[in-house]
Amino acid sequence: MAAGSGGSGGSGGGPGPGPGGGGGPSGSGSGPGSNGGLGSGGELHPRTGRLVSLSACGRTARRQQPGQEFNHGLVLSREPLRDGRVFTVRIDRKVNSWSGSIEIGVTALDPSVLDFPSSATGLKGGSWVVSGCSVLRDGRSVLEEYGQDLDQLGEGDRVGVERTVAGELRLWVNGRDCGVAATGLPPRVWAVVDLYGKCTQITVLPPEPGFSPPTPIPTPPLEPLAPTEDSALAEQGTSADEAFMVSPAQARPETFPNSLESHNDFANMELSEVVSNTILSAYNGGLLNVNLSSPPAGEGLGSSGAATSPILTSNDALLFHEKCGTLIKLSNNNKTAERRRPLDEFNNGVVMTNRPLRDNEMFEIRIDKLVDKWSGSIEIGVTTHNPNSLEYPATMTNLQSGTIMMSGCGILTNGKGTRREYCEFSLDELQEGDHIGLTRKSNSALHFFINGIDQGVATPLTPPVVYGVVDLYGMAVKVTIVHNNNHSDRLRRNNAILRALSPEGALRRAAPAAQAEPERLLFHPNCGQKAAITHEGRTALRPHATDDFNHGVVLSSRALRDGEVFQVRIDKMVDKWAGSIEIGVTTHNPAYLQLPSTMTNLRSGTWMMTGNGVMHNGTTILDEYGHNLDRLKAGDTVGVVRREDGTLHFFVNGMTQGPAAWNVPPGVYAVVDLYGQAAQATIVDDVEVAPVPEPLPEGNNQVSPSSPSSGAGGSDLRFHQLHGSNAVITNGGRTALRHNCRSEFNDAIVISNRALRDGELFEIVIQKMVDRWSGSIEAGVTAIRPEDLEFPNTMTDIDYDTWMLSGTAIMQDGNTMRNNYGCDLDALGTGARIGMMRTAKGDLHYFINGQDQGAACSGLPPGKEVYAVVDLYGQCVQVSITNATGPMDNSLATSNTATEKSFPLHSPVAGVAHRFHSTCGKNVTLEEDGTRAVRAAGYAHGLVFSTKELRAEEVFEVKVEELDEKWAGSLRLGLTTLAPGEMGPGAGGGGPGLPPSLPELRTKTTWMVSSCEVRRDGQLQRMNYGRNLERLGVGSRVGVRRGADDTMHILVDGEDMGPAATGIAKNVWAVLDLYGPVRGVSIVSSTRLEESEGTQPPSPSSDTGSEGEEDDEGEEHGLGGQNEVGIIPTTLEFLENHGKNILLSNGNRTATRVASYNQGIVVINQPLVPQLLVQVRIDFLNRQWTSSLVLGVITCAPERLNFPASACALKRAAWLLRGRGVFHNGLKICEKFGPNLDTCPEGTILGLRLDSSGGLHLHVNGVDQGVAVPDVPQPCHALVDLYGQCEQVTIVNPEPGAASGKSAGTQGDMEKADMVDGIKESVCWGPPPAASPLKSCEYHALCSRFQELLLLPEDYFMPPPKRSLCYCESCRKLRGDEAHRRRGEPPREYALPFGWCRFNLRVNPRLEAGTLTKKWHMAYHGSNVAAVRRVLDRGELGAGTASILSCRPLKGEPGVGFEEPGENCAPPREEQPPPVLLSPSLQYAGAETLASKVQFRDPKSQRTHQAQVAFQVCVRPGSYTPGPPSAALGEPPDPHFSPAELEWVTKEKGATLLCALLVRVE
């Protein structure tokens, strides 16, 4: 080549690296030819990608067939790069057919011997490539958001790479240094350019010197930066930040004239972005080039410009202008625009930017809301009109000057079409969430972007000063301005995912240059016959995993250091084989080891974890150790570490599994066996594992998987430094609090410092609360990055990408999507722990005090990062992150959606038969009073519905009666929120909107099962669920059940197929589609007669079951009848079939667990019979473990049962009591039932009993805790799991009558007050348990919610469980309460408060409460809501002052038979207290004239109810005067009482004592 070509002026200088001759054009200076001209990297190597052709003496490269091919365009420099010289290319030509564009970098591979891959990202062996705005090393991303996005460069733009003398890689764009992209480059590298995607032709420009300092020696001070120049903020890898001030006379490259002004994309960064990127440490080593001073083009600081045009500083945020269309409403700090009345008006929705757009600045918006009413949609473009002086038109297309708009898929200039088919996308077809952007290039070309994809040049000539403009027209209602760092989730780097060849494509930090490469843990090249090592020793795989299941052994390249964790991530699995990955250590050097087919065949120096056991030299030493590796999935991690004390520990998903072996010698190599399903694994560098617990002093040192200690500690999750205005972050980011908590109740949102990983728990503990406000903490997750979140008052104000739990409501994007979730955050107090976790399936789970509450919602986007977010709202003031925060077991995290089959469920008890609704498909005929449905014609239009909503645990079941074999398909059934009556007239009419088939029923949310597929609103959710419904025959039964845990279950021939879907709404109807071969069905199920919507009412001897506070004769009620105990057989013993760690003794009546913490299941030989109490005593507890015994029943034959490691793993026919929860087939169906079994001390006697209706009762020390499980199938056997702390139990034969809570000879001498509510003090080893959900009905809960709305101090009421008692029809009948009782001396009758709910009040301790309850009479006093607090504060009725509760009426209230004093007369205080009206009948005292009604809205159901309040009081005999009723009543309120004694009046002070507040709700 000719030296000095291209006008360099130089001469001489061949292609070698030597200096050239001459100087610039005049023979002097420092022109390009002075250092060799083009001889140093100025040419491209003749060997190229297969589609590249070279021209212009090897300086121009063109990719052939650009319309058909997007890759194979790789070119390299002819010579290695010289340090400090920039290899620069110019983009000559681009096409719009593809996504992605030019990629550039360096490689250590010699092009003369290189086997060219299809793209630059396929280069390995020391290659660094900048792709888009990512830096990749050997195809793996090491730095994101670097420099300028190369995909946005246009024709004529220049890009170059430089290797500095310090071994750094720098990128140059249009003469601008983008900073350090990589460090540690080898001394000999070639430039590499990939003509990828849109880029089809480039030309090499003469090489130029770089601007980076060649050595770390301090540079002399440069002259100050001119006002119109930019400052480049260089963030070096390990040195301090330095700002290099570039002077045009000293450092600007001569061949890039005016480049700092004409091509400055980095000047577009807002100040907030600069600050955010500076403080973030995620991308150390990146370089930010920020222009904080230069104004937009055409508005510089020149002599004339400064005087004629206002200067807009570049750090002005790009927002919407305050002046806008007449229907526009701005919000979100003028970043969001919304058109008012979108269903009435379709125009007058024009908004403009607050300032002109700069060159190359992206103006991008996100569509937030659309409506379907209009045609046409959003329009976007630019205009030269200043918004301050513009009279806004109805639509921007009405402007006839200075306006360029994109409308549909065309371009309009001044209201007239100039390009009809500008791009493939039409703005009218975009959906909510899509992005639209535009930019004016420095060459005056206007480009539009849709979801990050450049649509090409819309117009080549755009005025220099233009404003962005958006027209919210037609369907478009709401948009928000977004910035570049907001949309990493959209299609900005479309090609990067498709071409990712490495499993390490996730976001990672660049490795420190100082890290020694040989020190990294790699796989040794000597591996199994069927294994291969790739990615520089980081990844091991079995290339033909489906052909063979073994010979996949790989070892580490060096020995492990003490305490060094070797951890791998499973990248790929196959489902052909059994077994999976195995991991361990060996003393054998991999260089000399002849590798076996599996490592368990090695008989020396080897420790391996396989399945859930540990093997040493091929022999099992621990059988049940930790999590089962065979259950792991792709993405899970396993690890191993040898501690200094010689103990070996394994890790699963970062969780330690405890010590597995002892006395392991030092210098062992890590070993991984890619066995069975495991096909590929990659070494994980940045290991984050929980700290290994210290060894216990003696005994088996395994750590139970359920132990809280196993989750302790080493998570890096903290609260982010960005938060709400009232929040304060302390304690190193682990504690968040709301200051001014008594004057501020919101603006205290805190968010996690990084995104949560799948299966990772983020748990906090409430540390401080105040009782000033209503409402409390709210918690959830958001996909909004903390840097992009403009913190609102509360997180429920966010209307996108946010999922929150508020109280019991699950809210998505500010809208309630589910009520009555399993926990209530408003009910939590100080010390409660709240956890959040997103599973790999995209489900969001909450944990309360470590207990999984089940899936709150599903469908969280799996590819989108989510951050934990906590709103310190209302009462909650301070929280801290707990040590339980961190990764959890994936299989445990998704256990609530397991699909294991459970035992066949019986149909509901006999009652009213189900019916089909009269609204049905047009081909359906209903017969036999709506219990039979037949499809009369065709194969579709066969929808039928249940007549009523399904209640919790209610089964709707049909039997197949007719088949038509000529059709294919299957019966479809499920649940829908669509009320059948909404579909119009029935009887086959089909209604106006009833679709022909169930998958098309999408007007309301519908869950359905077809064949073996689960769908929601027609969208596939699961495959391979249960039995295939296509195989149903005549006589087959199929049903659907809505579980109490908001799950949908399908039953086939009585067998539960497990949960098909979660998050089912409360109000759902059963729906069937008589589709295809199934032609006729008949109903075989019936609805329940008893209360089942809430939970079962209390049992006869429940702890809330008696009138104990006020009745000393309570022994007579609720203790006999069905509570009698059957005769205890003398042959009760444990079966010989039991867990492997059990040893039986004492005639098989004592069971002892002799090893480990599990494998301790025992079953009693005799099945349970009604009224037979079977009891066991806890003999011995080992405090080394956590958790304790599990109690329950199984209905399968125990003699042939193969017991699992723990009872909770029983997935068929099992009902278990564990802790305070009730479980069915491994799924929690109830919580907070009875006392916590994990805290029972030694000597506690626990019992199980079946009542006459099949309800399973739990007894603790002889006290019945109520019905745990209703309708247990029989026969069933009692089961005990000696788990965790419980190591020995013995069967106890109680004396007859023990079940009733009495012991022989003592009950008669015991005061009723000693047995109040069924639990004696001697049996309570902890705080009294809260009222169990199983022991309260819906009416009770409704009254309790109303009582809470009164905001009465809790100190007035008795603590649980003595707090309240329900007297609704169901509860009082189940207890057997009599309607009337007698009390006092002399005895007087009074009525029980049937239909009301009683809230017991504390008795004044100065009074002799025991005497009062026996000798005083019982009566009622009607009141109103406004008076309740004053009565409680006073402590009695009519305490000598004017009382609004006296029978003297209030103003505006009806008279009650007494004269009202004059208006200005003060009532007498001591001499004549106002009389108080009482009655022994609440029917009279609770009449509306005496107890006024008030309306309220139930916070749970949002329905309006009417409520009344009254007081139950003790009244001193002789202090009152009985008389006839004074209130005007239409009929006798209570015929049981004589009208002459229905009303009691007292005037004596101290004659009444408040006993209870009564509430009645209609």
Swiss-Prot record:
Which gene specifies this protein's sequence? NEURL4
The protein's superkingdom reads Eukaryota
- Keywords of the record: Cytoplasm, Cytoskeleton, Phosphoprotein, Repeat, Ubl conjugation, Ubl conjugation pathway
One protein family per Pfam: Neuralized
Give the Gly residues compositional bias ranges. 1-42
Q: How is this protein annotated for GO cellular component?
A: centriole; mitochondrion
Location(s), subcellular: Cytoplasm, Cytoskeleton, Microtubule organizing center, Centrosome, Centriole
Give all Phosphoserine modified positions: 502, 907
> What is the official name of this protein in its record?
Neuralized-like protein 4
Region labeled Disordered — which residues?
1-48, 207-236, 691-716, 1086-1123
Post-translational modification comment from the UniProt entry: Ubiquitinated; undergoes HERC2-dependent 'Lys-48' ubiquitination. This ubiquitination leads to proteasomal degradation.
Classification via InterPro entries: B30.2/SPRY_sf, ConA-like_dom_sf, Neuralized, NHR_dom
What GO molecular-function term can you cite, just one? ubiquitin protein ligase activity
Assign the protein's first listed, main location to one coarse class.
cytoplasm
Q: Where is the NHR domain?
A: 41-207, 317-484, 520-686, 716-884, 913-1086, 1131-1294
Q: How does it assemble?
A: Interacts with CCP110; this interaction propmotes CCP110 ubiquitination and degradation via the proteasome pathway. Via its interaction with CCP110, may indirectly interact with CEP97. Interacts with the E3 ubiquitin-protein ligase HERC2 and UBE3A. May interact with MAPK6 and hence mediate MAPK6 interaction with UBE3A. Interaction with UBE3A may be indirect and mediated by HERC2.
Where are stretches of biased composition, namely Pro residues? Answer: 207-224
Originating organism: Homo sapiens
Q: What is the taxonomic lineage of the source species?
A: Eukaryota, Metazoa, Chordata, Craniata, Vertebrata
Give the matching CDD domains.
SPRY_NHR_like
Q: What does this protein do?
A: Promotes CCP110 ubiquitination and proteasome-dependent degradation. By counteracting accumulation of CP110, maintains normal centriolar homeostasis and preventing formation of ectopic microtubular organizing centers.
- What does UniProt say about this protein's domains? The third NHR domain (NHR 3) is required for localization to both mother and daughter centrioles. NHR 1 restricts targeting to daughter centriole. NHR 3 and 4 are required for CCP110/CEP97-binding, but not for HERC2-binding. NHR 5 and 6 are important for HERC2-binding and centrosomal localization.
